[in-house]
Amino acid sequence: MKMKIWMAALAVSAGLCTSAMAQVTGKATLDGKAPEMKEIDMSTVKECNDQHPDPVKDDSVVASEKGELANVVVSVKKEEGMDLPGDVPKTAAELDQHGCMYSPHVLTAMIGQEIVIKNQDTFLHNVHALSSANPPFNFGQPTKDDGKKIDPFKTVETFKVKCDVHPWMLAYVRVFDHPFFATSKEDGTYSITAKLPDGEYTFVGWHEKFGEVEQKGTVKDGKAEVNFVFKSSDAAAPASKEMKEVAVKSDASCPSCDKPEAKVVEKDDKVLGPQAMAR
């Protein structure tokens, strides 16, 4: 009998914990047809190509047939004079490299949070941050690496990270000065787990191609639901456009990257790798 009571109490406790974890929830959707994603041609880079039995597409826009939109970063808009108290997350924000792609495609972090860069591949990648407000970094990871720590970010900023070895590799980083942010999953849903005080807020949904959408929301008893709708007509450019001119440059911290300049181009509806242009 005691065991049953204990198990029931545990179940209730687990339910409360799960409920308490989800403070602000919602969904991001796309109104209209999503831009067609180009296939990435890795055929000239064997170590990359061998890891993908199926074609890999540019992941600038990841949307389902229902319009569920991934990689939307939702955050509380910090109005002038607003105080948003919150602890720096204890877990590190991790950017991984696997199969010659970045994961996650959009990394979010708070000022002061530990940052770790991983490489699951057994060959060279170069991690090149195109930041301006925060100190940029540019280093090579020549073999599998379970985690290289870099200095925590110090300033709010959004910037790109690229690989100078595999020019199609592109990720975004968004840095906040509060912990009230989350990124939508493939089903479009997101969950901000940091506890936000009750009140009226403006929430911002950001997507690299569709820009920003603002929504008002009321947090009551620690809970709120805020949904975002992006218009496909607001796409800044074809998803692979930014990847057409990605220069490969040498860097003192990555001697193996010293090679002639290479570019990513489109051909036959594919995004080509550095050597494929010659075919």
Spans of model-derived segments:
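Compositionally biased, low-complexity segments enriched in small residues
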Residues: 1, 14-15, 259, 263
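Bacterial N-terminal signal peptides that target proteins for export
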Residues: 1-8
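Bacterial N-terminal signal peptides
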Residues: 8-17
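Extracytoplasmic copper-binding redox domains, predominantly the cupredoxin/blue-copper superfamily
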Residues: 21-279
